[in-house]
Amino acid sequence: MKRFALFIFLILTICSPTSVKAQLDSLVYSPESAKLNAEGKNELRATVDAMTFFRDNEYNSKHLIKGYTLPGVWLSPSVSYQPLTNLKFETGVFMLHFWGASNYPNANYANLESAEAQHTTKAFHCVPIIRANLQLTPQVNIVLGTLYGKSAHGLAEPLYNDEMNISGDPETGVQVLYNPHWMDLDAWVNWQDFIFRDDKRQERFCFGLSTRFKPSRRKARFQWHIPLQLLMQHTGGEVNTEAQDRSIKTWLNAAAGVGFNVPLRTQCPVSLGAEFLGTYFSQQCGTALPFDKGYGFLAQAHAQVWRVRLTAGYWASHQYIPILGSTLYSSMSTSTKGITLNNPRMFLLRAEYAQYLGKGFSWGVRFGFDLHHESGVWNANDHTYTHRSMTNDFDAGIYLRLTPSFLIKKFKTDQTK
């Protein structure tokens, strides 16, 4: 682990600058935009979207989550056609491969940590890519099929685990995007599991809403925003009478707060910012989880210097359970059933570096350090309560993103009347 960190440090030290942009989310995780270009009308294009990655999670909080490593690549070649200035179709395939893996769970990859090696496929995990993108106005897009998802939603860490950018399936369903100058709105339904009659699995889908209000004037130096986010996971179904578990389960996560960003007048591009979030958890239906309600508070400060983004934050919660967020923010263990944490606290540090290499190519690295502290740990299996514990966790990852696009043919517009 120390050699891996030293290797990344040396790369950062000797690399030469080619861009002043620096955000792992925008450059590496979610570089594509849903906005359609009028110049793309009648174009037939081939795109090769891929990411190679190596992420190591050294978790010492064994009572909460076990450590693991994700080495691999995902590849998503596709062909797109834009018959109109405001309509685009895309089809392809998404393939995920972990180095050294020969069997893959045959399921929707929404939480890789809980996936079991049963009903497997060989060589790689594969799902289709089919998307229709209709741009009703310059500010409104309706997407059917494969969504612009994952980090593109802009969800906070307690609601969404950034690791799903490398291990999660593409989201599928319906999505509405609304982006006037004063706000960004993203509403979607991600249909994760479809069932047939007498299916042994349950129907499962997730509804999400991510809004970011921007009251500041466009040219104002001090930019502040108000995030409002919601995730609701539903599991059920009426036609799967053979399922072992037919109980309805509905869970909700929400977050709201305020944040700001201020660019400094320096020769080197520098900006400072902070964000304060309150989060909420609710078990709307079912008794699968140990808590019915919970909450948490996250305060973060960040500094963007050249291509480097540094973040420091503090998290405090009570009976909060993330639906799609990292277990590090949870009051419930995923490594051992029956273990819960009493009032967990976490001090977190993040360091990110992202570099634009050229059109269709970018790379980045990320380091994370977390210091956990809770009032106590309750084990329902043997009815024991351990007072006060403190642990630390570390993660590091390196990512290379490729999104080259090739024009196959531009069809001529029919001028006949």
Task: For the regions a language model picked out, list residue spans one by one.
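Surface-exposed loop and membrane-interface regions of Gram-negative outer-membrane beta-barrel proteins
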Residues: L87-Q135, E157-P158
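Sec/Tat signal peptide C-region and signal peptidase I cleavage site
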Residues: T18-A22
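Exposed, low-structure sequence patches enriched in small/polar residues
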Residues: R3-F4, L24-S26, D49-M51, G72, ...
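Surface-exposed coil loops of outer-membrane beta-barrel proteins
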Residues: N141-R212
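Surface-exposed extracellular loop regions of Gram-negative outer-membrane beta-barrel proteins
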Residues: S76-H97, L177-W188, G273-E275
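Surface-exposed strand-loop-strand hairpins of Gram-negative outer-membrane beta-barrel proteins
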Residues: M51-W74, Y104-P105, A117-Q118, D382-Y385
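Sec-dependent N-terminal signal peptides
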Residues: F4-I14
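Transmembrane beta-strand segments of Gram-negative outer membrane beta-barrel proteins
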Residues: S26, A34-E58, L87-F89
